[in-house]
């Protein structure tokens, strides 16, 4: 009753709504104007006019109305007879990317006028832009290469200008940017280098369009080792709840295609599809050995998981993981698979079943019956039941598993058609808890199409995906009813085809009608040309207008093949070759195409698979997506009144909805909408459901695009060569080039559409995946399929040896030869003799043997190095002809690749502790010769043969630093302050060489690269509040450091002149610093001061404030800035207090203040402080420097005067900077006094151009560069330098303009020995002698108490041979309350490596800020050390056995007071035992 009452109410509403139309549509003109709901600028659009039953001449106009005014789309159109006509128009580009405008349609005659205004969306046609990187994942320090591709919607190249392109790291820091990037022929290639320690995680490349739209591309940065092999897990896609066994196959294959020997562990876990730890209900594990094909198949019994019982409780699935452990190396890699659990053993897929039916037109159903694997099931009975139509039927599936039905819809009285398809028989299970076996069944519900006269048209299409450039035939079925048909002689059906939001095709079909018929039924075929412009989706609307004004229509969506007009092919000839050989690459494409080439090691893609660049990916780009626009207001058809809140009884589909789904809007006075105002939610129409799952899609084409069967087709094989290749001579392969990206290049194909390149194959034995992306002005984009190239040798040799040994130790060198040929090989293995080592074969006759097919063999030598330094080991494996058989086979050798040679370097180090002394002098000669003597002495305990020395000459004061800007100090760079020593000196070098006009492109490129890398690294240490600290924010728990933030601020501000620095980093740092300023103008300290020299002045606050003021002024802030002005007031007050308190204990603070006042232009205060400092200067040997009165005392017994400490170098350099910053220029007196300090500073330089630590290096190089620029002379002076011994050695160097920056060097032969250095001619030279040697570890009075033990202590435990624990105890015993930051450097025993996880755990301790692990040592960064003992321990394990193990050294030192150092040594618990080598 309720249903009938509601239906009557809706029908009554409909009748009322239609009363006004009755008089209008009897004899009056009928209009329908179809327009895309979304219009694009600068491209031809169409508006289609349909004027029917026209009884007067009318004028048609169309206008777009916006805030900028009214624009006519076309000239007035005068029509005097029935017409269907489409008019083209073009809209000019909008100032914004899109806007809603009003489209006004007017059709006006003498008697009648039709006018309607609707809202349309007008959009600028955006370019299609994407980014391609050379690979999806990068390691720290690698170069990221990428190309920007720009096309129009037709995929033709654009020369587009992008205002900005930039890189964002995981913290959204902009680390690199390019401005005004322009594509040429649609392509632009860019690159940038990652720092050695970047933030790891996802990065973004962002391309900003002129419209403001951003296109993004992601890549990953992380530390990783490329997988040598991949693991493929083969499992069924699905099983049924009735299955008891799952077959799991795991196969491991090297990247060069050969099977992996080893073991596999298979884990099968049951749970719901999320597989979180909470939803796993159980796992089973199986272990097995891989067979000769690298595979293992396991039958896993799954009855314990009770699938039938659990099916109703949760959606079940299995996750399978297989971990393969490679034999010999222990390397592990994994693969995984997933298995769905289904209720039945087979299921139905609906391939055809429309969402709506039409009374009087057959309803077509096509299903495919598939098994649990998705394979079709032929010759099986399929039954169908449609109770609403009184229809039942049965048929048998064909060879493709298909069953077809046609349901008569004449007898359907309801608004819905419910269909049930089942296999064999209907399920007897009524309740959901039934566990009896079920057969496949599926349900589908279709709803009626609305027509007042019960007239319909239906488009029937078979194809799933339409191929390009072909004719597609669409069958149209129609039935027309009603009295109005009696007056018709013919009826015309009109159709439109839409794609990419525009009307592409229109046409019509005329059907003749016999007079007096009350029902007309028939069908006809329409042929639709499939054009490229229709890719990827086309929509077709067909309609006709009946005499009474009723419109009947249907629409259909076509999936069009994602084809590209530019046919690109890439191939290699040959497609398999030896490493380092030549191969021929051929690319074909449309003539004059610009092609981007790429070839990547398959191992990279195994590590991180990426979406392959394909037509599907291109057509899925945002710029290629098409969407319908539905106005939010001003749509007369959308303004529906509310009705009663009940579930609608009808889900009928009307013409209005067909029009809207096609992407059109209709301006009309015809009947196109369902005559009811009841609130019907069309978007919730339920559709057919394959098996049990509910599918709510409304797309008819969905059934055609369902994946049915995944069939792997065999790859095409290369045709066999007709002629055998000629025999090559023995080609020896020496492999040392192992890139991850082999090819990344742009090439242009010639007028014939071909380009050919000769390529050198890298040395990696792997499979390379290559592809080409080409753009043509004529045919647009083209993509090649992936081409494979296999770099492979029939056999090759691998060496196993330690990273380094100490002289006197012995180790076993192993050479393993792997044969991947199906035949045995007579093999000869040779270790090249050398005077640098002795080698004894472990086995007799091991240099010649028969290597079996697909086998491996290891030859070993007991090696004892004799020389120090880098020792080369060269091992060759050669397949040689043999007259006799090889095993049971005839001896054969390969045609190519018969010899493989591998060269590896071993570092042989002397015993004891390394010592280095540097003797530097700035020598300036005039007319007379200038000379000085130098005695190179050695302590009596020097390690034999460890002494070496060299003499260097440079014509420029910064030559050494310029050459070694990334190695200025031989110390770790693991914190935010130390990183800046890699950054700031490059600024001073660039400024200096620029000012002196000595800057070359090579030096500039190198310095800019270092600046960019340092900039990236420093952002690792930034906090969210804009500050910086030594080790970053530690997940938000760390505190920003005031001093370091000021240092970074000034460095970034100065670097802006050379590289991109995101201004926000400078602003953030300044804002944070300003918040640390007190009312007095001084700055409060935040975070720990790693360098205690900052505490050596009046107090922390004044010294710190002087440093920050200096940093702000060096950042180009004026002294009138409020923050700077207040800071200077703080310094002025502090200086007055220092003056009143007397001199003597504030040297460091005064040096900083003098420079700060000089920068501020306060010459008076600068001069006062310099005068005070002059009284405290230490003047000796024609040099001037300053020292702290309370500096740490140095140990006695030094053979040479030790290098000055960091603080002394800093303060002396600050005095130089203060003198050279005099306004308007330094006086001759300033330069003369500075010269004395510069002489002292140069004597403190180390052999790399740096000083003892980081801050002194930065400040001193700043002072040296400014002094060098102030005194630089372009005169043609050519001094010569001679170094000679007291014996026969003599070497002369000439210094002139051409080699001024060149570092000239010679080794000194006599140590110990006396040498004389003489300079003649005119000019200054920088001379430096470096002496290095080793001494045994001796007992001393160190600044640190250091105790090192091993656990176990002795070799009682057999495990002590392979791994043991190192335990350290450290405390400070120096003259200060606490040290600065301390480094503990633990060197590894030869053949041992640290267990990284046990080292990284130490970072959880409060006093360990950072750890660094390499093959040869472990570094621990300690904030500071007091007299309280700190304890640490970690585990090391044996990698390569070594005999006669020597002790390893542990060094603990103050980072800023490097003379405060302690040494200890440790040995393996079993070092006294005979090792198995």
Swiss-Prot record:
The keyword Signal applies. Keywords: Bait region, Disulfide bond, Glycoprotein, Protease inhibitor, Secreted, Serine protease inhibitor, Signal, Thioester bond. InterPro entries: A-macroglobulin_rcpt-bd, A-macroglobulin_rcpt-bd_sf, A2M/Complement_sys, A2M_N_BRD, A2M_TED, Alpha-macroglob_thiol-ester_cl, Alpha-macroglobulin_TED, Ig-like_fold. It holds the Pfam family A2M_recep. Residues 1-24 form the signal peptide. GO terms for molecular function: endopeptidase inhibitor activity; protease binding; serine-type endopeptidase inhibitor activity. There is a cross-link at residues 975-978 (Isoglutamyl cysteine thioester (Cys-Gln)). GO terms for cellular component: extracellular space. It is found in: Secreted. It comes from the Eukaryota. Disulfide bonds join 48-86, 251-295, 269-283, 468-563, 595-774, 643-678, 850-886, 924-1324, 1082-1130, 1355-1470. Glycans are attached at residues 55, 247, 301, 321, 393, 508, 750, 777, 872, 994, 1143, 1314, 1427. Residues 601-750 are annotated as: Bait region (approximate). Monomer. Belongs to the protease inhibitor I39 (alpha-2-macroglobulin) family. Protease inhibitor with a wide spectrum of protein targets, which attaches through its thioester function. This is Alpha-1-inhibitor 3. It comes from Rattus norvegicus (Rat). The gene is A1i3.
């Amino acid at each position: 009753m309720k249903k009938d009452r509601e239906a009557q109410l809706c029908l009554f509403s409909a009748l009322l709504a239609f009363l006004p139309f009755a008089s209008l549509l009897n004899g009056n003109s009928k209009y329908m104007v179809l327009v895309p709901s979304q219009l694009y600028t600068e491209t031809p659009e169409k508006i289609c006019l349909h004027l029917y039953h026209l009884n007067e001449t009318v004028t048609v106009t169309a206008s777009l109305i916006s805030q900028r005014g009214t624009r006519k789309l076309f000239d007035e159109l005068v029509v005097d007879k029935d017409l269907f006509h489409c008019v083209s128009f073009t809209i000019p580009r909008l100032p914004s990317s899109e806007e809603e405008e009003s489209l006004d349609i007017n059709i006006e005659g003498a008697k009648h006028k039709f006018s309607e205004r609707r809202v349309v969306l007008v959009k600028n046609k955006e370019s299609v832009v994407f980014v391609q990187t050379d690979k999806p994942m990068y390691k720290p320090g690698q170069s990221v290469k990428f190309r920007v591709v720009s096309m129009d919607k037709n995929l033709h190249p654009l020369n587009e200008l992008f205002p900005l392109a930039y890189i964002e790291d995981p913290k959204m820091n902009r680390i690199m940017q390019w401005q005004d990037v322009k594509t040429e022929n649609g392509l632009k290639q860019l690159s940038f280098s990652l720092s050695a320690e970047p933030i790891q995680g996802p990065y973004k490349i962002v391309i900003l369009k002129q419209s403001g739209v951003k296109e993004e591309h992601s890549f990953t940065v992380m530390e990783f080792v490329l997988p040598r092999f991949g693991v493929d897990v083969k499992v069924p896609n699905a099983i049924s709840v009735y299955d008891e066994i799952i077959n799991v196959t795991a196969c491991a294959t090297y990247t060069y295609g050969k099977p992996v020997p080893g073991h596999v562990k298979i884990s099968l876990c049951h749970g719901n599809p999320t597989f979180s730890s909470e939803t796993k209900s159980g796992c089973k594990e199986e272990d097995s050995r891989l067979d000769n094909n690298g595979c293992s198949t396991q039958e896993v019994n799954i009855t314990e998981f009770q699938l039938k019982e659990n099916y109703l409780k949760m959606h079940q699935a299995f996750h399978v993981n297989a971990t393969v452990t490679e034999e010999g190396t222990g390397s592990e890699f994994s693969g995984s698979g997933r298995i769905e659990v289904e209720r039945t053993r087979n299921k139905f897929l609906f391939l055809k079943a429309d969402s709506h039916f039409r009374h009087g037109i057959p309803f077509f159903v096509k299903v495919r019956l598939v098994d649990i694997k998705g394979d079709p099931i032929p010759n099986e009975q399929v039954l169908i039941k449609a109770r609403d139509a009184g229809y039942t039927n049965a048929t048998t599936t064909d060879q493709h598993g298909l069953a077809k039905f046609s349901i008569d819809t004449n007898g359907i009285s309801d608004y819905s058609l419910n269909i049930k398809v089942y296999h064999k028989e209907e399920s007897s299970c009524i309740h959901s808890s039934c566990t009896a076996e079920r057969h496949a069944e599926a349900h589908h519900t279709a709803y009626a199409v609305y027509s007042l006269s019960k007239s319909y048209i239906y488009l029937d299409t078979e194809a799933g995906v339409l191929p390009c450039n072909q004719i597609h035939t669409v069958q149209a079925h129609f039935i027309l009813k009603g009295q109005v048909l009696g007056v018709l002689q013919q009826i015309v059906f009109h159709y439109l085809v839409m794609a990419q939001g525009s009307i592409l095709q229109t046409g019509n079909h005329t059907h003749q009608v016999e007079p007096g018929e009350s029902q007309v039924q028939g069908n006809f075929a329409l042929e639709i040309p499939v054009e490229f412009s229709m890719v990827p989706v086309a929509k077709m609307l067909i309609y006709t207008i009946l005499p009474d004004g009723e419109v009947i229509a249907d629409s259909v969506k076509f999936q069009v093949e994602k084809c590209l007009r530019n046919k690109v092919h890439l191939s290699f000839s040959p497609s398999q070759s030896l490493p380092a050989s030549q191969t021929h690459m051929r690319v074909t494409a449309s003539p004059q195409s610009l092609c981007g080439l790429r070839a990547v090691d398959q191992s990279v893609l195994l590590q991180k698979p990426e979406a392959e660049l394909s037509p599907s990916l291109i057509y899925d780009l945002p710029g290629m997506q098409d969407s319908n626009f539905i106005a939010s207001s001003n749509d007369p058809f959308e303004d529906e009144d509310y009705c009663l809140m009940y579930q609608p009884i009808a889900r009928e589909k009307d013409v209005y909805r067909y029009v809207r789904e096609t992407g059109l809007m209709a301006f009309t006075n015809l009947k196109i909408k369902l005559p009811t105002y009841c609130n019907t939610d069309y978007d919730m129409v339920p559709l057919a459901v394959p098996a049990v799952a509910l599918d709510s899609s409304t797309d008819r084409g969905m059934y055609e695009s369902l994946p049915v069967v995944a069939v792997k087709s065999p790859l095409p094989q290369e045709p066999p060569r007709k002629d055998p290749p000629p025999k090559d001579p023995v080609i020896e392969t020496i492999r040392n080039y192992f890139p991850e990206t082999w090819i990344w290049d742009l090439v242009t194909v010639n007028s014939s559409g071909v380009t050919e390149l000769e390529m050198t194959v890298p040395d990696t034995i792997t499979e390379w995946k290559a592809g080409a992306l080409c753009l043509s002005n004529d045919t647009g984009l083209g993509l090649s399929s992936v081409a494979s190239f296999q770099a492979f040798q029939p056999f090759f040799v691998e060496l196993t040896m330690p990273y380094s040994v100490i002289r006197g130790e012995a180790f076993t060198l192993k050479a393993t030869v792997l044969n991947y040929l199906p035949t045995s090989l007579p093999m000869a293995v040779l270790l090249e003799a050398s005077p640098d080592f002795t080698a004894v074969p472990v086995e007799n006759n091991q240099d010649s043997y028969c290597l079996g097919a697909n086998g491996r063999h290891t030859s070993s030598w007991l090696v004892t190095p004799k020389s120090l330094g880098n020792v080369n080991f060269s091992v060759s494996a050669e397949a040689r002809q043999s007259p006799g058989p090889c095993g049971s086979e005839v001896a054969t050798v390969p045609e190519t690749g018969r010899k493989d040679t591998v060269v590896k370097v071993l570092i042989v180090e002397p015993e004891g502790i390394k010592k280095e002394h540097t003797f530097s002098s700035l020598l300036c000669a005039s007319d007379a010769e200038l000379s000085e003597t130098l005695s190179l002495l050695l302590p009596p305990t020097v390690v034999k043969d460890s002494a070496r020395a060299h003499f260097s000459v440079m014509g420029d004061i910064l030559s050494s630093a310029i050459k070694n800007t990334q190695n200025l100090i031989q110390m770790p760079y693991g914190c935010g302050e130390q990183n800046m020593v890699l950054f700031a000196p490059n600024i001073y070098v660039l400024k200096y060489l620029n000012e002196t006009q000595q800057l070359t492109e090579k030096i500039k490129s190198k310095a800019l690269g270092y600046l960019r890398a340092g900039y990236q690294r420093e952002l690792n240490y930034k906090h969210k509040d804009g500050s910086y600290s030594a080790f970053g924010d530690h997940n938000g728990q760390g505190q920003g450091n005031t001093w370091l933030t000021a240092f970074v601020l000034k460095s970034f501000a100065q670097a802006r002149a050379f590289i991109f620095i995101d201004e926000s980093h400078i602003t953030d740092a300044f804002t944070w610093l300003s918040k640390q300023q007190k009312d007095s103008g001084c700055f409060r300290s935040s975070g720990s001061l790693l360098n205690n020299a900052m505490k050596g002045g009046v107090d922390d606050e004044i010294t710190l404030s002087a440093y920050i003021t200096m940093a702000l002024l060096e950042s180009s802030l004026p002294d009138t800035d409020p923050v700077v002005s207040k800071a200077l007031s703080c310094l002025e007050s502090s200086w007055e207090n220092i003056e009143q308190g007397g001199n003597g204990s504030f040297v460091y603070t005064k040096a900083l203040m003098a420079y700060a006042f000089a920068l501020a232009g306060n010459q008076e205060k600068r001069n006062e402080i310099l005068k005070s400092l002059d009284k405290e200067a230490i003047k000796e040997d024609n040099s001037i420097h300053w020292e702290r009165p309370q500096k740490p005392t140095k140990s006695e017994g030094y053979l040479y005067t030790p290098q000055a400490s960091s603080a002394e170098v800093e303060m002396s350099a600050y005095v130089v900077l203060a003198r050279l910053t005099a306004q308007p220029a330094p006086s001759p007196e300033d330069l003369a006094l500075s010269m004395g300090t510069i002489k002292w500073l140069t004597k403190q330089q180390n052999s790399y151009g740096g000083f003892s630590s980081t801050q002194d290096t930065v400040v001193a190089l700043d002072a040296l560069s400014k002094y060098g620029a102030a005194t630089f002379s372009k005169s043609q002076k050519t001094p010569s330098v001679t170094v000679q011994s007291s014996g026969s050695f003599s070497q002369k160097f000439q210094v002139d303009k051409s080699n001024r920056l060149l570092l000239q060097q010679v080794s000194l032969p006599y140590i110990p020995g006396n040498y004389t250095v003489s300079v003649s001619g005119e000019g200054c030279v920088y001379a430096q002698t470096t002496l290095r040697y080793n001494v045994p570890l001796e007992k001393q009075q160190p600044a640190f108490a250091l105790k090192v033990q091993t656990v176990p202590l002795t070799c009682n435990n057999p495990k002590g041979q392979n791994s043991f624990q190192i335990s350290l105890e450290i405390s400070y015993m120096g003259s200060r309350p606490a040290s600065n930051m301390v480094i503990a450097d633990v060197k590894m025993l030869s053949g041992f490596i640290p267990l990284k996880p046990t080292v990284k755990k130490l970072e959880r301790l409060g006093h360990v800020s950072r750890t660094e692990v390499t093959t040869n040592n472990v570094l621990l960064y300690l904030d500071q050390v007091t007299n309280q003992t700190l304890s640490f321990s970690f585990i090391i394990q044996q990698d390569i056995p070594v005999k006669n193990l020597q002790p390893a050294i542990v060094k603990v030192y103050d980072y800023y007071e490097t003379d405060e150092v302690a040494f200890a040594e440790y040995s393996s618990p079993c070092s006294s035992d005979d090792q198995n080598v």
